[in-house]
Amino acid sequence: MSFDISKFPVLAKANTPEELRKLPQGLLPQVSDELRQFLLQSVAISSGHFASGLGTVELTVALHYVYNTPFDQLVWDVGHQAYPHKILTDRREQMHTIRQKNGLHPFPWREESPYDTFSVGHSGTSVSAALGMAIAAGKEGVGRKVVAVIGDGAMTGGMVFEALNHAGDLHNDMLVVLNDNEMSISENVGALNNHLAQLMSGRFYTTIRENSKKVLKGMPVIKEMAKRTEEHLKGMVVPATLFEELGFNYIGPIDGHDVDSLVETMRNMRNLKGPQILHIMTKKGRGYEPAEKDPIGWHAVPKFDPSQFKKPTTKPGLPTFSQVFGKWLCDMAATDDKLVAITPAMREGSGMVEFSQRFPSQYFDAAIAEQHAVTLAAGFACAGLKPVVAIYSTFLQRGYDQLIHDVALQRLPVLFAIDRGGIVGADGPTHQGAFDLSFMRCIPNMIIMAPSDENECRQMLYTGYCYQDGPTAVRYPRGFATGAEQIDTMTMIPIGKGVLTRQGQKIAIVNFGTTLEAATDAAEKLDATIADMRFVKPLDLGLLEQLANSHDVIVTVEENAIMGGAGSGVIEALHKMRIVKPVLQIGLPDEFIKHGAPDEITAELQLDAQGILAQIQAFMA
């Protein structure tokens, strides 16, 4: 569907940045107001990331007004906040398709628009990418400007400071906009600071500053006194010291919702030499009261009615696997004060809210710093604590070296509760949990488990927690559990042992994880044997040998990349046992899985019951 653009008369004149730049500056506040209302109505219909975009409306308008995009390059960090950017860059009429199959990508995406200079989805990449572009722009020598936009949350990642340190050393021209939405606009972010920012970014101040540096270069004592005086004066009103020490000229903080001040400050900063930081203060959820009061709850939303001022409530039903994990975590912490749980800024998504409230001294949020989170767990384990790392599959990729070097190599008993394993859906290729079984399976000393239902998930978490001879991983999907009867008593599962769940003939289906239900449906129609393998590593070699010797064909099923996944492990095991048997591997293909509803993607990839049946029948034909 498309919106009645006549309700947004000024925004209608700014379908592209080129059109926006033709408008008089006096209309920019109205453009911002209409853009915010359009975003509100659009996301209410489509679902998607919400609160972040509401907070970056004025910033987006100012950036595209001052900078000659797409010639000048904007790099957005993560991309949750980039919906206003998409609306202003000739994608307004497609916004209702965002995150849907064949619709707009949920994040800035190079293949989608020339205005999207860098494809994103994970945090902390913008400054590094922008620095690369800035260096290239300097070599090109045609006056191209480069801007990175990063939020205060992403600034907790070490990669950002690595890039800032490098940029300050190289001294290429670039602007980093720090969008600080941790707190609401405070009194010191008003007329005085806006005026100060414009003054300090203006030609007079910067010329005096640079010329003074040249004059004082040969007089180090006086130069140091001048520097201290400048820092003292600036330090009274701005937290400049950290960025200045990294080699950046710091401007701010200024009101990120005052579009005129943003435009004037950016105009001044556009022509400054060297690396620049513009610190702006914004309010996440700006302009929609429920989102302002609860920006975390309104970070991403389903379809909703804006007039109701509340998110739609879901009917009580099956728990999610994240909730199953959260309950297990609380149950264990109640009996063992040595348990410590770590998350890299994913408390809500990982089901840890209750745990963090009931056991605050055992809860550690490492912020968006996956490398640190994994090695923090290693340190806990060395000291005799029992760490559990709750992490999304896609984010564990960012702590891979630490998993190998700091945990597995030392055979430390760290339990990894890996959420979002397999197809995630609407967030697309940056968030699909497609690779974890493949990249963990090759690591020595790892125990890897894939539960088929929520009860098995609890028992596996307990098994991993009790196992003290090295790291363990329990990998489970996003979404609702299967409805299996829960067994409250927790018992250890024998390491490396699978179970037969159906006896058939000719075809043996070897399943890993929650694809068991779909695989079982296919097995019923084929009169096939099916095994719930439970362990990806170590494999149940005895069960595999038995199945291979009594069946004509082996079929492996997993929601992971086929290359290097559990099925590859089965083939390797059969080869080692010198058993020659046809093997069909069913799983994710050798491509990045696009965005869409999980059931749509599953059907397209033939990972549902009908697709598994069709693949086996084609293989047997």
Curated annotation (Swiss-Prot):
What is the recorded name of this protein?
1-deoxy-D-xylulose-5-phosphate synthase
Instruction: Identify the SMART domains for this entry.
Output: Transket_pyr (SM00861)
Gene Ontology terms: biological process: 1-deoxy-D-xylulose 5-phosphate biosynthetic process; isopentenyl diphosphate biosynthetic process, methylerythritol 4-phosphate pathway; terpenoid biosynthetic process; thiamine biosynthetic process
The top of its lineage is:
Bacteria, Pseudomonadati, Pseudomonadota, Gammaproteobacteria, Alteromonadales
Q: Which PROSITE patterns match?
A: TRANSKETOLASE_1, TRANSKETOLASE_2
Q: Which InterPro entries match?
A: Dxylulose-5-P_synthase, THDP-binding, Transketo_C/PFOR_II, Transketolase-like_Pyr-bd, Transketolase_BS, Transketolase_C, Transketolase_CS
**Species name:** Shewanella frigidimarina (strain NCIMB 400)
Q: Which domain of life is it from?
A: Bacteria
Q: Which keywords appear in this protein's UniProt record, sorted alphabetically?
A: Isoprene biosynthesis, Magnesium, Metal-binding, Thiamine biosynthesis, Thiamine pyrophosphate, Transferase
- Provide the family line: Belongs to the transketolase family. DXPS subfamily.
